[in-house]
């Protein structure tokens, strides 16, 4: 598979940077140390051998192979210049650095010096990520400080432009709180006005006032019951009064009936013989009297029932 068919995205570059840091670490603890100590005959782990072995033992189809080989070739060739650049911003000798920190600083210094298309903030951020994966807990302080000083030296125009942009942003941020404070005061004033105004709601309130609501409903029900009883008593009293008044009307009816009987008796006497008239009149009078007796009996029973109903309603 050719190198042009491999990935070249930001993720692929990040993976290439990680593999390069691991390869540089391996080279620093073997051939680079032997070279410093003068044991040249022990050198048997050249950078290109490390790269070939890494490609053979790892899935590199998601790695930017070109960038990986570039760092594995150029950083060992520029090791003396890069170490001198790093040493300018260190507070200790470079040979006292941890090997992992040394490898991360080599990658960062190389990118700051040779890869100007990569923003210096990206270089610092990627160095921090490498330290999070492979470095010590507090090593990020040293790495960040050294690379930041190197960026000021190697990327002066970029750092100045970024600092000016940050200054403008901070000035805008400093001017905003005044308007925000005014808005907050306005909002608080509006909220206080809203709180002062009672807001009607159709939803039932769930609070301690439920007890008073229940008491009011019970009192209303009792009032309705008493009103109903009073109306019933008035109805029964009116009915009794009507029935009590009726005897006068019954008496008038009886008188009218007697008059009618007398008139009919006179008519019968004029039209029929005396004996027949007397018998017919007697029969008619008897029938009318029986009818009146039955009506009076019905009246008595009705009045007694109404009196009983009145007494029960009063109880």
Curated annotation (Swiss-Prot):
Lineage of the species this protein comes from: Bacteria, Pseudomonadati, Pseudomonadota, Gammaproteobacteria, Moraxellales
SUPFAM superfamilies cross-referenced by the UniProt entry: NusB-like
Molecular function via GO: RNA binding
Organism: Psychrobacter cryohalolentis (strain ATCC BAA-1226 / DSM 17306 / VKM B-2378 / K5)
Protein name listed in UniProt: Transcription antitermination protein NusB
Biased composition range(s): Basic and acidic residues: 302-315
NCBIfam families, sorted: nusB
GO biological process, one term: transcription antitermination
Keywords in alphabetical order: RNA-binding, Transcription, Transcription antitermination, Transcription regulation
Family according to the record: Belongs to the NusB family.
A Gene Ontology cellular-component term: cytosol
Keyword Transcription regulation in annotation: yes
UniProt cross-references to HAMAP family, sorted A to Z: NusB
Chain positions covered by the region annotation Disordered: 296-315
PANTHER family: ANTITERMINATION NUSB DOMAIN-CONTAINING PROTEIN, N UTILIZATION SUBSTANCE PROTEIN B-RELATED
The protein's role, per its UniProt record: Involved in transcription antitermination. Required for transcription of ribosomal RNA (rRNA) genes. Binds specifically to the boxA antiterminator sequence of the ribosomal RNA (rrn) operons.
């Amino acid at each position: 598979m050719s190198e042009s068919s491999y990935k070249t995205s930001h993720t692929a570059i990040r993976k290439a940077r990680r593999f390069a840091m691991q390869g540089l670490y391996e080279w620093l603890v073997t051939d680079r140390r032997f070279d410093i100590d003068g044991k040249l005959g022990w050198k048997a782990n050249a950078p290109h051998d490390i790269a070939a072995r890494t490609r053979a033992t790892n899935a590199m189809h998601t790695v930017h192979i070109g960038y990986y080989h570039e760092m594995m070739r150029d950083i060992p060739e520029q090791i003396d210049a890069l170490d001198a650049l790093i040493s300018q911003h260190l507070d200790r000798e470079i040979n006292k650095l941890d090997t992992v920190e040394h490898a991360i600083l080599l990658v960062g210094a190389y990118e700051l010096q040779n890869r100007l298309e990569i923003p210096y903030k990206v270089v610092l951020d990627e160095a921090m990520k490498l330290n999070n994966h492979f470095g010590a807990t507090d090593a990020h302080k040293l790495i960040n400080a050294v690379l930041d000083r190197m960026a000021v030296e190697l990327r002066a125009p970029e750092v100045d432009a970024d600092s000016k942009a940050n200054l403008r942003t901070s000035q805008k941020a400093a001017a905003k709180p005044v308007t925000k404070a005014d808005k907050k005061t306005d909002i608080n004033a509006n909220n206080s006005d809203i709180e002062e105004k009672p807001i009607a709601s159709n939803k039932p309130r769930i609070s301690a006032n439920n007890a008073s609501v229940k008491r009011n409903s019970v009192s209303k029900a009792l009032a309705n019951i008493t009103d109903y009883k009073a109306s019933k008593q008035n109805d029964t009293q009116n009915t009794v009064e009507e029935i009590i008044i009726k005897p006068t009307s019954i008496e008038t009816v009886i008188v009218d009936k007697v008059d009618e009987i007398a008139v009919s008796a006179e008519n019968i006497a004029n039209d029929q013989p005396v004996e027949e008239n007397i018998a017919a009149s007697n029969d008619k009078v008897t029938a009318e009297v029986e009818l009146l007796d039955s009506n009076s009996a019905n009246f008595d029973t009705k009045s007694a029932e109404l009196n009983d109903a009145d007494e029960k309603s009063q109880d």
